[in-house]
Amino acid sequence: MSNRQIKSDVILIGAGIMSATLGTILKELAPDWKITVFEKLEKAGEESSHELNNAGTGHAALCELNYTSEKKDGSIDIKKAINVNEQFQVSRQFWSYLVNNKLINNPQDFIMPLPHMSLVQGKENVEFLKKRHETMIQNPLFEGMEFSNDPETLKKWIPLIMENRPAGEDIAATKIDTGTDVNFGALTRMLIDHLKAKDVDVNYNHSVESLKQASDGSWEVRVHDLDGCKMEYHSAKFVFLGAGGGSLELLQKSGIPEGKHIGGFPISGLFLACNNPEVAEQHHAKVYGKAKVGAPPMSVPHLDTRYIDNKKSLLFGPFAGFSPKFLKTGSNMDLFASVKPHNITTLLAAGVKEMGLTKYLIQQLMLSKEQRMEELREFIPNAKSDDWDIIVAGQRVQVIKDTEAGGKGTLQFGTEVVSAADGSIAALLGASPGASTAVHVMLEVINKCFPQHIKEWEAKIKEMIPSYGLSLAENPELLKEINATTDEALRLK
């Protein structure tokens, strides 16, 4: 590479919620560091972070049934739900810090209070939900969660869903008022604007072409300036790959051994969006159902109130689609280009293992709009086709890797960090709960990649996140205090 390199302390690739969060935290911890951001598109937060490319759920395991499972003895395992909730609590604390320190002006531009509900039908599912509720309310994280199978109560909670339901139907719901709707696109843009004001060099229309580690451990990054039609050469001690579906390709280009034997499978999301404001006005909650038997976790149907640009809207989905692209704006060659000699057996093993997912995707692809409306009518019996339009959401690249528990070619359904042994580069891969846990995940990156600084940074981290290093589930008094301060800062009460 050219010797005429522009040097930075940190390079962030991708201007989505993950890079924006990491950049903001690092600027608070090390204000003198030079940080440079490269984004291929012309604006920040245009891919998975964009408000129309995700459901905007503040994932806190308040309503998502796939975070709780029934054990063989009939008891309910809520460990995963506790973990997800704790992670979202970290995000709430950090966002409150930003508001209290005037780094964000109006929290309601990106977060709104909204009840989170779980809804089930059928005797067995009602029994499961009741047991789940009884287990969860014993934990302080889920205090205030209500259960009801009384039709009159449910009509008050979810009038649109309860209208014209057959008498005597087995139906039940839980409701908790501490849920949120989060506009991650708006939040991303606010954080990036803040970084620019703090002299972070944010470059749009810049595509990273190659990464190579130099003999001193730093990274040399070749970047194509799409506006100026020229190549630029940059170097940094640390590089973060926060390019959504594009992170896998960049991880492979880095050549680090930790990036071997990892593949990706792209799944696109479709939603039905209500175009009738009168209908949207009748619903005020995020209501999550139960995935059908044999369906993957990402197929959980939900009916969501959304707040976008101060307007209330209503979405139902997701329905799965398939495109070989790893990004909405990506190439049809993305999937094929990601197949390498080191991951081909991993991908083939997943293909054999995941026949159920393949069958599910084929079935989803063949659905007509009217068949999708029939699924919506399981939630809203009176739904009219003319009131709903199909919209295409973002691409999600599910990670496929070899694991001890699952063996070769195991499909992962979460968010994970892959980092080099020397901590000089890290990549964020995967999907849900994603953006909701961005602060927790970026602190994980910082702990993995900057261990030599953690001691000097600890006091500042605790100022930003008072529960840092502690379990709120095990510290109910601290939880109460933090809930009160974050509710006030974020105007959630």
UniProtKB/Swiss-Prot annotation:
InterPro entries: FAD/NAD-bd_sf, MQO
Annotated Pfam families: Mqo
GO terms, biological process: tricarboxylic acid cycle
Pathway it works in: Carbohydrate metabolism; tricarboxylic acid cycle; oxaloacetate from (S)-malate (quinone route): step 1/1
Recorded catalytic activity of this chain's protein: (S)-malate + a quinone = a quinol + oxaloacetate
EC number: 1.1.5.4
Listed Gene3D superfamilies: D-Amino Acid Oxidase, subunit A, domain 2, FAD/NAD(P)-binding domain
Protein name per its UniProtKB record: Probable malate:quinone oxidoreductase
PANTHER family for this protein: L-2-HYDROXYGLUTARATE DEHYDROGENASE, MITOCHONDRIAL
